[in-house]
């Protein structure tokens, strides 16, 4: 059985993956790499208060971070 923290992290990651895969049509593997290398993901893993924010709030942060990335560069950091 997973902890509440793990469950919240899965929800947030799935929200970011859904945005990249279903809305922007990125391949799943590339999307997973982008999410896991993002500053938003690292903030989620390090800050419990941020992890408890709503998915729309976190997704908005991820979208802003993603918008600052050059189209040819898949790395969000």
Spans of model-derived segments:
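C-terminal alpha-helical interaction appendages
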Residues: 1-77
